[in-house]
């Protein structure tokens, strides 16, 4: 029969609510195209200082650009000097003196360019750092201010990854590229002004060049911006999906889900790749049109100039040469607009995506200052006729005309089935949501009229699945003091309060035993603590501020019986004088409540005290009977609050000596630890990185061939110009028809050059984007796949938080896209042009060529390579620093309910901003140093042009080279300098691409310890039993000095049901991790069917094992998808295959598994049934519903070994009873071996063997009856949970 209560869905209180769409199709919504309005808005985030810096920088860039154009005047005078010498007007000595004087102007220009280019690059880059910092700050502030429903809808994308990756795109488009743009525009304008002054008629003809070029660039950039925006949207949702996968990496390993999930991730990438392919013809058009238009205009100008000269409209050849050189300079700088326009387009698209969230007004804004803040809080809570449906499912009513009065200072308990609305009341009291109708009051005031921050600071919450933040234990508990008078107290005062709260939560003792006590770092989401330890720290965090209203949503669900009893007493004490609302499935924890409210279907079924409800013999009494344990307590067996008894004390004495490992073992542990450290990796240089990228995708050979041929054709542009312009000078020595005929011929040659540019750059633009999009797709998929291959200890490392990893998944492939797109073509063309121009110079005038090429090119290239090397180191450092800020953002947004309930939005934002400020400040000095190298790359060309001009004229005057040869050689050197200067304008993209390639290559070759190898490929686990543990000792790899298991000996036979019980942190869950082979023993061994576990193929072994975790992990997708992921299919294809084992699971199998987990009733009652989206992390389901889906996923696997780590901790009493029967049946199904960790002893009392852990060892072992008779630790645990 269907349970109607279950149809009233309660979205989870789980924290993994970041933002994947609730629906499965379409993959992304169509977004609005980013406009350059978004680009302009970027600069509204600049402060006064940044605006001043930008203004100074732009002036410097314009001056630098003017300097580029002023060389045309020098060239004009140079032609006059040449003409005078050729015509015999000046002597060789005068010729050399005049040449030396003109050469000095080049030296001065070089010095000016050095100062100006250094100035504008440094100032603009620093200003961009600050602007992007402000945008990221505003973005995270907006994210933290959104109401919880925003995340329920999956509206956010991966917020942390977007803040980092989109910030990098904005940085790229709002820093030095602006200076290069203004420099180019200034050079273009100045060159045309010079040309107008010299010969206005001829210059007017050349106006067609910029008009056509800018028009083409504008149209293409607008269309391309729309595609870029769409790609960013798809990648944002792909990143969010990846975030959910990485957050649940243990489940991925346990069930072998990697290939299926990566394939699902790839569906997003395929969609993005389709859009990316549409950019290829646009880039082909953009580059080919620019160069073609320029050379067509150039040919037209030369043809017209010759004819005007022949008609006497132009007086001297020098004027034509000055105009033509001005057109060349203007054209060269105009061609740079194309790649810059793409950078600006990407920056605009990235900014527009961030601005959408920044502009969104939250319905419940925690930053708001409005609302009442009463001076005194009594704690009277009243819900009056409250009706509520979650925004994601408006058709399902969770609370229906619900009314409840909670008197001040009293304890009110809420019990009932999962999905009955208990946790919904908590969400409404915390103002995560507003009721659909009805009123909620605190001390008579509508909570909607109270200040949100004030309300949450006075109504504290401990959640069912507590979330801690990266940092120390002290930091986490101190968060509870935010917004109180003790927030800014001294550390000593805060520590005193923190310790008092920890003692109240029965956490002080275990915290004191940690390596660094309260300063011990606990890892991402508190991952280095056990579930019970995390829960106690969360309780301490909530009570440290001494709130007037306390909400406990299954606050003791993860505690062992002894700790639960003590903590419950502490909570009972803490509840004195304050209003407490308790949600509990363990009825022992609420029997002393002043009022127990039994809920079902959003209504109150019955309420009263424990005694009155027992006497009524109704629903509550039935639940109590289910949980009672058969223990006859005696007076002397009462729970001892101070210790576990004498037997425990003896154990402690024996354990103190076992704390160190032999040197060889420690050496092995350190080597494994160092292996996962990227900083120890030897980095590839640029050529090796490029070679790796080419080798990685051999299917792109055709595209690389097209690019190479196109680059070879494109590199002929500058040498061709040098030869043609040298011939132009010869034309002016002729007269009459001969001059016009030669002029027409060379003008037609420029048209041929334009045609060649059209073909070459069309091919290059199309092929490079094809390569870039393919590599981006491939490496996004590969980097996630390779991350999921790694051992669990890889994810335990501080630098490998979920947020940091997702940021790398997004930013590194994009860096490769930038490198291997048009940038690599421009770099290759520039390199080939330097080489060909150098060869041409040496060929026509070997003395001049050798002196200038080997005197000027090496220092220029050297300065550029030094910049790339320094820039690469800086990029690695800043990426690491920004990774820290990304981790803060990721954990805050993933834990949005915890952040909001603690009202610590400002604190999180301050931490995030401090990390951003640290990243900016620490980058300034090395960035300023790299800019010196950049300045040198921009000025050295002028210095070797000066050398070439002076030495070349000297050779001409001495008759050692002809005038034509000198012109060819000198112009070749001039164009080589232009090419080399352009080459290093893209050094930032080069360094980022090289660093990204290095990380991806390192990760790809990094082999996990737990993997399939040729040696173990055919070694299976046999029958899966017996399992024997021989003196197993274990310390987590990152905490070698903190032993968890201290010599465990155990044998589990086929078909047995074994239970592990004991206090939190004693090693129970670690045993499960050992059996799942998340880690290997530090010393000792585990054997399966007489084979050592480390010698068995881990894939084959895990195929016979199923795991249900204490905090179940679900992934974005439907309920069906999540259960299907539990099925092992021996024919599963690798991730790059289109086949998927998940699709082969029948609906009948799904239904059978759901029925076994007591989940079929609630699933079948949903409108979409098994095709209902579970949401990111299962956020659309309640905790109990998620747990049952996880159990169904384990049961559908039909495992030989079933591992249950608090598998029923989130279930209500009735569901637990049914599911427990199913699990017991599953445990006795055939020869299945079952290992269960449990704090609810009623769930394991029928186990064949119960192992009581204490201090990393098995203290007691036996059946339930045997251990009760023995009267030790286990008996006292049972007494703590007895209800009668």
UniProtKB/Swiss-Prot annotation:
It is found in: Cell membrane. Its main location: membrane. Residues 55-346, 705-992 form the ABC transmembrane type-1 domain. One of its GO terms (biological process) is transmembrane transport. InterPro entries: AAA+_ATPase, ABC1_TM_dom, ABC1_TM_sf, ABC_transporter-like_ATP-bd, ABC_transporter-like_CS, P-loop_NTPase, Type_1_exporter. Residues 381-626, 1027-1280 form the ABC transporter domain. It comes from the Eukaryota. Residues 1-11 have a biased composition (Basic and acidic residues). Keywords: ATP-binding, Cell membrane, Glycoprotein, Membrane, Nucleotide-binding, Repeat, Transmembrane, Transmembrane helix, Transport. ATP binds at residues 416-423, 1062-1069. One of its GO terms (cellular component) is plasma membrane. GO terms for molecular function: ABC-type transporter activity; ATP binding; ATP hydrolysis activity; ATPase-coupled transmembrane transporter activity. Induction: Expression is strongly increased in the presence of cycloheximide, imazalil, itraconazole, hygromycin, and 4-nitroquinoline oxide (4-NQO). Glycans are attached at residues 385, 401, 488, 632, 800, 995, 1122. It is a multi-pass membrane protein. Residues 1-24 are annotated as: Disordered. The chain crosses the membrane at residues 55-75, 99-119, 178-198, 203-223, 282-302, 320-340, 705-725, 745-765, 824-844, 846-866, 931-951, 955-975. Belongs to the ABC transporter superfamily. ABCB family. Multidrug resistance exporter (TC 3.A.1.201) subfamily. Pleiotropic ABC efflux transporter involved in the protection of the cells against a wide range of toxic compounds. PANTHER family: ATP-DEPENDENT PERMEASE MDL1, MITOCHONDRIAL, ATP-DEPENDENT TRANSLOCASE ABCB1-LIKE. This is ABC multidrug transporter atrC. The gene is atrC.
